[in-house]
Regions:
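Secretory/extracellular carbohydrate-interaction modules
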Residues: 1-76
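Surface-exposed coil/turn segments at beta-strand junctions on protein surfaces, enriched
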Residues: 18, 95-97, 128
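Short tryptophan-centered beta-strand motifs in secreted/extracellular beta-sheet-rich domains
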Residues: 25, 98-114
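Short beta-strand segments enriched in hydrophobic/aromatic residues
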Residues: 27-29, 80, 106
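Hydrophobic residues embedded in beta-strands of well-ordered beta-sheets
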Residues: 72-76, 109-113, 120
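Short, aromatic/His-centered strand-loop micro-motif at the edge of beta-sheets
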Residues: 77-101
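Surface-exposed loop/edge segments in extracytoplasmic proteins
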Residues: 86-89, 118-123
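Flexible glycan-contacting loops in extracellular carbohydrate-active proteins
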Residues: 122-154
Length: 154
């Protein structure tokens, strides 16, 4: 998956999810995922997740990430909106190039995020119809250069 310089995300057609149960991916961040954008460095980029109608800023659950200039690692987060209120929780850091397995399990009352064995429960109720949320760089900043993430559905 490639995010071009000056954009937030690659163009993709929407993907409807009917009775979603599990989103699972094999993920490796490449050297191109290193960046320094100054004051916005702590903003959380989005990797993948599920959004619910009417809009994912109302209810959604995603795995987020950012690059840590000090450690040289990728920080990973649970990232969500619950009834319009945003939340996040740090999960772990991984090395550039390291292969990891990430998943989001959709349950009736909540979601379980699993980042290579580190699990976190997000109190956003699952719904019968949603849509796939794909990689997005930012906050409000666009990608400072082209970034490639090896993201393979499993």
């Amino acid at each position: 998956m490639k995010i071009q310089k000056g954009t937030h995300a690659p163009f993709r057609l929407p993907c409807l999810l009917i009775n979603p149960k599990l989103l699972a991916y094999r993920v490796a961040f490449t050297e191109s995922c290193r960046y320094d954008i100054g004051v916005g460095q702590g903003d959380i980029n989005k990797l993948f997740g599920v959004g619910y109608f009417p809009h994912h800023h109302d209810n959604s659950v995603r795995i987020g990430w950012n690059y840590d200039l000090v450690s040289g690692k990728i920080n990973l987060f649970a990232y969500w909106y619950a009834e319009g209120l945003r939340g996040w929780h740090y999960l772990r850091s991984v090395d550039i190039g390291e292969v990891n397995y990430f998943s989001i399990q959709v349950r009736e009352q909540d979601h379980i995020i699993d980042v290579s064995g580190r699990k976190y429960c997000v109190d956003v109720a699952g719904r019968s119809v949603g849509y796939l949320l794909r990689p997005y760089f930012g906050g409000n900043r666009t990608s400072p250069h082209t970034m490639i993430i090896d993201l393979q559905k499993i």
